[in-house]
Amino acid sequence: SALSGRKGHIAYATTKGAVVQMTRCMALDCASDGIRINAVCPGATDTAMPMSKHSAPISRERLLENCRQSIPLQRIADPEEVVRSILFLASEDSSYVTGTTLSVDGGTTA
């Protein structure tokens, strides 16, 4: 929601977009102290959250299939995939990365 719009989600998308800008500004503010600031924007992930967004009854399988069809990689992320991206940004392997927003979304925002 931070990197793309969606009808009926103005408040949610606005707050997510603010996190992207906050990440950039904080990265600049903290760089001289050797502190790196980055953000991760996960796409559809196999958690309970997508089910909680729907007021109409829908089966988990149907919801996941609907999501899969809109994702270029044609699958939902496993939570561990999102965790690994966060661990990468927290590690020394990304020591020259700051102020970035990493999309972990199967190509949805490509």
Model regions and ranges:
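Active-site "substrate specificity/gating" loop of NAD(P)-dependent dehydrogenases
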Residues: 3-9, 31
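Alpha-helical segment proximal to the catalytic Tyr-Lys
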Residues: 28-32, 95
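A glycine/serine/threonine-rich, flexible loop-to-helix segment
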Residues: 44-70
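Catalytic tyrosine of NAD(P)H-dependent dehydrogenase/reductases that use a Tyr as the general acid/base
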Residues: 12, 20, 80
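Conserved SDR Rossmann-fold cofactor-binding beta-strand/turn motif
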Residues: 36-46, 90, 103-105
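Active-site helix of classical SDR
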Residues: 15, 23
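C-terminal substrate-recognition "lid" of short-chain dehydrogenase/reductases
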Residues: 75-104, 109
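Active-site segment of SDR-like NAD(P)-dependent oxidoreductases
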Residues: 1-4, 26
